Amino acid sequence: MAPAMEEIRQAQRAEGPAAVLAIGTSTPPNALYQADYPDYYFRITKSEHLTELKEKFKRMCDKSMIKKRYMYLTEEILKENPNICAFMAPSLDARQDIVVTEVPKLAKEAAVRAIKEWGHPKSRITHLIFCTTSGIDMPGADYQLTRLLGLRPSVNRFMLYQQGCFAGGTVLRLAKDLAENNAGARVLVVCSEITAVTFRGPSESHLDSLVGQALFGDGAAAIIVGSDPDSATERPLFQLVSASQTILPESEGAIDGHLREIGLTFHLLKDVPGLISKNIQKCLLDAFKPLGVHDWNSIFWIAHPGGPAILDQVEIKLGLKAEKLAASRNVLAEYGNMSSACVLFILDEMRRRSAEAGQATTGEGLEWGVLFGFGPGLTVETIVLRSVPIAGAE
């Protein structure tokens, strides 16, 4: 007698919740220090005659709370591609030529580190999720990474282009569904971002573009996600408890990006921090209602640091203690805003800080946590996390 459909479906699914099993990160070698960046930026874009605008940009950089960023674009590359340095010059071909090659290469570095920490052969990877806002190509960056890593040709690939800063949450939401609905699945998730698509010279009439030039940096992060980990050989870092996405009310046009002949342009409204802080309480209440959690200082925080104003207003609105957003602020300071990759860097920062401080769990000694992605839409991704005990912790 043929097995019942329900039995077949049950056998296809994992038993337990999805968990992050390993994390790896990577940046280009070229580090740019924020204190020196205004002079460098206005010199390389031949804009030093715009003295008042340069002073505004210096103030933006000073207020950014960023110490340094990493960028693939070096002075040599920019000198060879002067149209990238202009504000409105046709330059998409030159930008595309860079990112379609370099985005998968940077992704490979992060993925190799994640796979090494995981400790299993790459042949066990069943699914690949690749996310980037940097360039579009066919076959995509997911295909290129599959070839670079030597993954099985039958790996199930998912390519997410042009999502923006919320997408670090999106990939976790998708990975959770894949891991929990496919028994034995091991999902490699990679976010790789290179600002070669958005770098451009200054304009006195487009200060929102200048804000982006003060904030964005390059980086790639990779994680392995799976359910029912092998207790002998796999070490979970965080469980993915729930995941949801929402579009904030009255936020249309708050963050826009448009791919044009001049590259990818970003447009930001000043009230983005206000829109997020106004709505974040509802996102938290909806996410944590099943757990009965209402004290936002009793959970650990991984919030996308779009800029310091977003973190500041969230902190004030929710009455968070200063240390709650320390991991997010530290990643912003050391790397800048790396779009989709940022929250995965913060996830890595969280587990490292917790271990180094001798905390009992990967979430600063706390059990429950939240990961937030904010981006175009205005879209918010909310992931509820559960930490795991750190071996040997008191």
Curated annotation (Swiss-Prot):
GO terms (BP aspect): flavonoid biosynthetic process; polyketide biosynthetic process
The UniProt record lists the keyword Glycoprotein: no
InterPro entries in the record: Chalcone/stilbene_synt_C (IPR012328), Chalcone/stilbene_synt_N (IPR001099), Chalcone/stilbene_synthase_AS (IPR018088), Polyketide_synthase_type-III (IPR011141), Thiolase-like (IPR016039)
Active site: C165
Keywords, sorted A to Z: Acyltransferase, Flavonoid biosynthesis, Transferase
Entry EC number(s): 2.3.1.74
Pathways involved: Secondary metabolite biosynthesis; flavonoid biosynthesis
Class of the enzyme per the UniProt entry, highest EC level: transferase
MF-aspect GO terms: naringenin-chalcone synthase activity
Reactions catalysed according to its record: (E)-4-coumaroyl-CoA + 3 malonyl-CoA + 3 H(+) = 2',4,4',6'-tetrahydroxychalcone + 3 CO2 + 4 CoA
Role played: The primary product of this enzyme is 4,2',4',6'-tetrahydroxychalcone (also termed naringenin-chalcone or chalcone) which can under specific conditions spontaneously isomerize into naringenin.
Family, per entry: Belongs to the thiolase-like superfamily. Chalcone/stilbene synthases family.
Record-given protein name: Chalcone synthase 3
Protein species of origin: Bromheadia finlaysoniana (Orchid)
